[in-house]
């Protein structure tokens, strides 16, 4: 396990600007801030209140009864809600909350920061190629929608690739279409079995 790296310096900006972007998942909204929260390539998914215990921001966002998931990446926070409230009401409430959280100079993580797995780089050529396609073509599109995609495993015998979808992609009604039509087709074209 390695220590999480997030930008403490940038969190203490005097001018916090935040805007929201909708995502393909109608229950998720991406809240973008004007500073870097987490170093490039890292992300943190909090699917439950219990999983959010190391992050005061995620924990406090779960204080909104309708929040069901919180996700941090680079310069944005994706919040997923239930159907009890519409975004026309929830959006300004959450946006103001996030802005005030950072204006109050609260930390993104407490002293018990979540640990990340150390990834050993002993990948086969096929896996390196797959990860390259994920990084260059797929990850940027998924991040624009407020989500993240991570390589999970590749079975060379079966030709089966498993990925992990996080943030707005988790539970999104169109995620199966994204996987089948987008990712599967691209992998078949760019990575030969």
What are these regions (language model features)?
Residues 2-193:
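Domain-level signature for proteins that mediate thiol-based redox and metal-cofactor handling
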């Amino acid at each position: 396990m390695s220590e999480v790296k997030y930008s403490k310096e940038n969190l203490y900006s005097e001018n916090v600007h935040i805007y929201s972007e909708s995502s393909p998942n109608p229950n998720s909204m991406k809240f973008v801030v004007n500073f870097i929260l987490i170093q490039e390539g890292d992300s943190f998914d909090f699917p439950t209140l219990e999983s959010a215990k190391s992050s005061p921001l995620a924990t406090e966002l779960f204080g909104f009864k309708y929040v069901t998931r919180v996700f941090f990446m680079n310069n944005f926070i994706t919040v997923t809600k239930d159907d009890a409230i519409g975004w026309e009401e929830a959006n300004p409430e959450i946006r103001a909350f996030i802005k005030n959280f950072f204006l109050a100079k609260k930390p993104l993580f407490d002293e018990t920061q979540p640990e990340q797995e150390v990834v050993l780089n002993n990948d086969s050529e096929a896996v390196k190629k797959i990860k390259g396609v994920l990084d260059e073509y797929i990850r940027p599109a998924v991040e624009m929608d407020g989500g993240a995609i991570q390589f999970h495993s590749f079975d060379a015998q079966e030709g089966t690739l498993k990925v992990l979808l996080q943030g707005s992609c988790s539970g999104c009604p169109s995620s199966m279409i994204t996987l089948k039509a987008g990712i599967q087709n691209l992998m078949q074209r760019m990575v030969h079995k």
